Regions:
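Extracytoplasmic metal-acquisition and chelation regions
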Residues: 1-187
Length: 187
């Protein structure tokens, strides 16, 4: 908690998931390319070329998210799950409510929290409630059953299934699905 002048504490939630923002992912790609070039100078030009191409794709992805947000009916998103997406939401000026703070190790939200989220979804007429990859969608489903909101996956790009790994799924592919699902929730 940080104390403010008015005497109220403000909780600061740290989130190590910096890659959830495509803008940050673009910076990370640049740093990785630089380090690889330093360690393997013979292939520095290849690293730089590949990085530039990938950064162009990340710029396009960022533009897609900005387009979705610019046409949104709302800025509030509800997660029936943990919330490792602070950098993403900060980047696009979105607000959220979640069943758990940050990446809590809790596995069951309090009944009061679920009731609050149900009320918020009803009050704001939110059409979708999200859950994360490799996580139980049960809380999102409960909220959906009570409100008519559609439970949808929002991928933090932190984990993939064995099948996704074996098939070579990429960050860009996972984030493209997020573009589609976010659009549904903000409409």
């Amino acid at each position: 908690y940080l104390d403010e002048d008015d005497g109220h504490g403000v909780e600061i939630e740290y989130d190590e998931h910096i890659w959830t923002s495509p803008v940050n992912a673009k910076k990370l790609a640049g740093v990785l390319a630089e380090v690889l070039a330093q360690e393997d100078p013979a292939h520095a030009a290849s690293y730089a070329e590949n990085c530039a191409s990938y950064q162009d794709k990340l710029t396009e992805l960022d533009a897609e998210f900005r387009e979705v947000v610019s046409h949104a009916k709302r800025r509030l998103v509800v997660f029936g799950d943990k919330f490792p997406l602070r950098y993403f939401f900060d980047e696009y000026g979105l607000e959220y409510r979640a069943a758990f703070s940050g990446c809590s190790t809790d596995t069951e939200p309090r009944a009061k929290t679920i009731a609050y989220l149900i009320d918020k979804v009803r009050e704001e007429q939110i059409p979708a409630v999200y859950y994360l990859e490799l996580s139980s969608p049960r809380v999102a489903e409960i909220i959906g059953e009570e409100t008519g909101a559609e439970p949808l996956l929002f991928h933090s790009c932190h984990n993939v299934t064995r099948h996704q790994f074996d098939s070579g799924v990429t960050y860009l592919e996972l984030m493209e699905q997020n573009v589609k699902n976010l659009k549904k929730g903000l409409s």
